[in-house]
């Protein structure tokens, strides 16, 4: 077959394979067009799950008669005109493919009228060449798009449609997501002539909470923490549920970037990391989060459906979201009674995002002026706060004001006792020593179950036999056997690393600011040299009871730094060794699943240990006696 140009209808049908997956995809594209047109009310009528009819009616600015013929043409749009527009997208649509693709696989009719026109006009495309026909019609200011008999000319696609109930459920979910993104817009959803969803315009915070409650449920609102978190040109707002309100499936996770609903791995990973040890792998967080940033810093031209985006500074976005959500969850653990009074002006000094300035050229839009630019400005104004629940709104400064962190109280010693009890029975003397070890595990120097003399280990090698339940190494030396707890080995590695004369440091992308109370400030004055010796770098402002963390030891980069610092300042440490012990006891440890990783950890610790300090490693060993099983 020679090379030839595809007919317009076939080319549009190929494009429709990416854009129009099911009736819900049509609803998404058409509603986004209505939003770009500046509509304040949108009505969505569905028949037979969208297979028979999808009708979207809005009160936007409408389309002029002379533009109607191009409205159904491929790659025709009024929202961008050059590469600069594409790199700073604020409108939801910009590709100019949706209407052409939908009309190629359905019977599409578009009726519209602008305020300047005395009458409305209707356009539809038909035939192999997708020729358009325009005729007068009766219609108020705004636009109505009717999509009838979806996939009527592509039977292979139509047979993949699910039941009417399933397809409408997908449409309902799309409308819910858009309604959360645009609370100021009123939405009405009908199915087979019956009104099923009606969301009124929400401007005030109480009205927005009602919409969130209608979509996510009252239980979510009662267990939600409100976030308003800023840093330079980044702004994170919305709600995250407390860890106890976890979900068995990922059905209450809504994230938006510049008002666009997206599914992004960076955002999801950051939120998941913020929850950390609060949730198991089978539990999912619930959240509704809005991220606003300079449109030049995000690429939305990744996929025709525009569900995916790429951040130019993905690591910065990840850390910003992780820190904002993490601080909100930690604040939830604090005593809310201490924050009933409104935040004072001096508590809020983070600069507001300013990228919506006149320096940024707005997108060209079918509606003319892009209404979402000014709307975003309004959203960004306000203080950085966290709030809990709908009945009572508590304010939290982003200055980490006296945050009381929540840490897991899992006892390593209990885990070890269970491990050793299930694996084998040790002699009475060893059991007694293990009990002593459980009581004194907060100090590395006292982690001794069966005391070992360094001379007994010198000149002989310990052979690694197995990894026991991913929690301990089973070692052999001649006829003697030992268990080496990996949790204690990791803590020893952290302590030895922080004792090195030249500690590798890493600057924070987003410095962490702490607002201290009197007791914490007094402890800071006593312990700041300990922080400096351990590789931390702060800027301090004692007059305002504030310190700012700028650099951290590289080995602690992935740790809960704000929680560690506050916890350390809640305690009194007279010596650097006590300080390091307390710090290392708070760190999140890695799970080790293979023997090779355990041996790597052991090798790293041995390299950090000086010859005269080998006793520190020997003190972690727990003697195991197999004699009674051989008799």
Curated annotation (Swiss-Prot):
<dbReference type="InterPro" id="IPR014762">
    <property type="entry name" value="DNA_mismatch_repair_CS"/>
</dbReference>
<dbReference type="InterPro" id="IPR042120">
    <property type="entry name" value="MutL_C_dimsub"/>
</dbReference>
<keyword id="KW-0234">DNA repair</keyword>
<dbReference type="GO" id="GO:0016887">
    <property type="term" value="F:ATP hydrolysis activity"/>
</dbReference>
<dbReference type="InterPro" id="IPR014790">
    <property type="entry name" value="MutL_C"/>
</dbReference>
<dbReference type="InterPro" id="IPR042121">
    <property type="entry name" value="MutL_C_regsub"/>
</dbReference>
<dbReference type="InterPro" id="IPR037198">
    <property type="entry name" value="MutL_C_sf"/>
</dbReference>
<dbReference type="InterPro" id="IPR036890">
    <property type="entry name" value="HATPase_C_sf"/>
</dbReference>
<dbReference type="GO" id="GO:0005524">
    <property type="term" value="F:ATP binding"/>
</dbReference>
<dbReference type="Pfam" id="PF01119">
    <property type="entry name" value="DNA_mis_repair"/>
</dbReference>
<dbReference type="Pfam" id="PF08676">
    <property type="entry name" value="MutL_C"/>
</dbReference>
<comment type="similarity">
    <text>Belongs to the DNA mismatch repair MutL/HexB family.</text>
</comment>
<protein>
    <recommendedName>
        <fullName>DNA mismatch repair protein MutL</fullName>
    </recommendedName>
</protein>
<dbReference type="GO" id="GO:0140664">
    <property type="term" value="F:ATP-dependent DNA damage sensor activity"/>
</dbReference>
<dbReference type="Pfam" id="PF13589">
    <property type="entry name" value="HATPase_c_3"/>
</dbReference>
<dbReference type="InterPro" id="IPR002099">
    <property type="entry name" value="MutL/Mlh/PMS"/>
</dbReference>
<dbReference type="GO" id="GO:0032300">
    <property type="term" value="C:mismatch repair complex"/>
</dbReference>
<dbReference type="InterPro" id="IPR013507">
    <property type="entry name" value="DNA_mismatch_S5_2-like"/>
</dbReference>
<dbReference type="InterPro" id="IPR038973">
    <property type="entry name" value="MutL/Mlh/Pms-like"/>
</dbReference>
<dbReference type="InterPro" id="IPR014721">
    <property type="entry name" value="Ribsml_uS5_D2-typ_fold_subgr"/>
</dbReference>
<comment type="function">
    <text>This protein is involved in the repair of mismatches in DNA. It is required for dam-dependent methyl-directed DNA mismatch repair. May act as a 'molecular matchmaker', a protein that promotes the formation of a stable complex between two or more DNA-binding proteins in an ATP-dependent manner without itself being part of a final effector complex.</text>
</comment>
<dbReference type="InterPro" id="IPR020568">
    <property type="entry name" value="Ribosomal_Su5_D2-typ_SF"/>
</dbReference>
<dbReference type="InterPro" id="IPR020667">
    <property type="entry name" value="DNA_mismatch_repair_MutL"/>
</dbReference>
<keyword id="KW-0227">DNA damage</keyword>
<dbReference type="GO" id="GO:0030983">
    <property type="term" value="F:mismatched DNA binding"/>
</dbReference>
<dbReference type="GO" id="GO:0006298">
    <property type="term" value="P:mismatch repair"/>
</dbReference>
